[in-house]
């Protein structure tokens, strides 16, 4: 669990007092850095090594003073030495490092002065030992307060999708297929994310793989099965002699690790792929890309038949802003100077409920929830000081306000896990602002994702219309010629005796079903759809039915 910022600042002050007179580069430098990591409640041994050998240009060899692979490179000098030269020396090590090992930060110190280089943001900072306590926020990446910008277009999202796709193919090739494979991959997605976002202790999963499994991969499947069981077991029910490498993992709950799966068989190459996945910085991965991740794993024929397609974040925002977000921000601006009204508005946010009746892997629900939580944080900044005692008591919006229906099991599983992940990212954002570590473990609430054919079940069985506020999503576009027998039967069932309905796209069934569902309510609906339903022969059939028989009104529309 991450320390509070107040505790970190106090430790930094004590650290500065203890080390203010040290001058020698080699004599005490390792103790210095061990104590430095302890400021943030992290064991240096767990994440970084001293004197890491590395090959330099021209066949020369060197040793990095302190190296945390993929995160931090430290060069340490005696007091008064040239720190600019030390930075050049640090950069000279880069050609000898693997892509996954390249650090995001370089830190130079001579006991008295610190120079931190943020390579991703292209920024650098300089301060003295006595000023360290004022600058500890710069080291949030050590403490667990990760401030990465999560960008949907970040190349790491594509890397993650490709690597998980490789692992999927390898497991499928050896006969590990169907539901066990799908759930197994979903669990690995959670583990990768938990590794880099302070759900687990830093490097706990990677260290478990590197140190507790054989290089040939022969025992990897059984070791992962053992880990899954530990993650599903409360601390008080675990064996007293449980291996220390497993005992540190938290109790997750949420039923994610509840089902016992067949043990998969790995080889050295498959183990290597999994390790490469772990070397990625999963804190930078957007849960909203899990849809494209899912698509990268499906074969093309399967994807075409499902009508699956990934909607960009920009297009999702074009839908949710006029549907509900713009209105909520307008209300926020009106009430933010009146704390009583603002508190009532905060309560209102926690009562909103959202349904995506064709949710896929949850892109719309994820982004809608993220935006709701961002607005909630703006409210909390006004209502509460940064010294609030327990931030868990003031965060009211939660994943159980979000509901989805998905015909395929795998994306339904991904959607539920992705909602937990975006929830954790939002909790880290709030932790950063209030200076407290806030994590919802064990998992007690979850998004209500139902695995079913949305056109064959009653939506009221998922959520009652009295409770629901908004319907949104991206139902599948499948033209009349591409529809299979089950889809044609769905169309007949939904449109019943509507004349000419045989020419309609499959997506129109969601329009009619939603129109029936929202009768005599204030529920608003917005879908992304093919433009064929607003031009040509489909217009007179679909919209006449919606306007004449259900009183539907169009509030907004966009062309993409």
Regions found by a protein language model. Name each.
Residues 47-50, 204-208, 331-350, 372-401, ...:
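Flexible phosphate/Mg2+-sensing switch loops adjacent to catalytic phosphate-binding sites
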Residues 170-172, 398-405, 519, 524-528:
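Conserved alpha/beta enzyme-core scaffolds, especially Rossmann-like or related mixed alpha/beta domains
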Residues 10-14, 68-69, 299, 394-398, ...:
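Surface-exposed beta-strand-to-loop junctions
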Residues 36-39, 96, 191-196, 322, ...:
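Active-site catalytic microenvironments for nucleophilic, acid-base chemistry
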Residues 22, 56-62, 79, 83, ...:
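Signature of N6-adenine DNA methyltransferases within the class I
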Residues 2-16, 130-371, 401, 405-414, ...:
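Preference for the N-terminal adenyl/adenosyl cofactor-binding alpha/beta module
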Residues 1-105, 119-122, 147:
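A short, conserved, highly charged catalytic patch centered on acidic carboxylates
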Residues 69, 101, 347, 352, ...:
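Structured loop/turn residues at beta-strand edges in well-structured enzyme cores
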